């Protein structure tokens, strides 16, 4: 399976909400946007755009961060500051947990 699928399986174990929506991961050039990734929500469709030229570790951390946002979408958490605080506070711990499982 792909790295993205492995990350999704890992995160689904912690965030069962992720299995209740459609998630599409789209590699794209986000250089001009100055971000590694973002999540767009449309009903129960969640599109994660992720920069197409990241190191493996940055890809893992970014996808984990964005999947936390998908979980927040399902939970109805809309406050941007709360959303980012939660995602940033968890991304490195979860990245290390994921890397230790591989």
Predicted regions and their residues:
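Short pre-active-site segment immediately N-terminal to the catalytic Zn-binding motif
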Residues: 44-63, 77-79
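Short, solvent-exposed loop/turn segments at secondary-structure junctions
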Residues: 28-31, 54-55, 68, 94-95
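Zn2+-dependent metallopeptidase catalytic core
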Residues: 1-20
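Hydrophobic beta-strand residues in large extracellular and virion-surface proteins
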Residues: 11, 21-25, 48-50, 63
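Catalytic zinc-binding patch centered on the HExxH motif and its immediate surroundings
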Residues: 17, 24-47, 56
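Hydrophobic (often cysteine-bearing) scaffold residues that line and stabilize catalytic clefts
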Residues: 3, 60, 64, 83
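Catalytic glutamate of the conserved HExxH
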Residues: 62, 66-70, 74
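Post-HExxH zinc-binding segment in Zn-dependent metallohydrolases
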Residues: 79-102
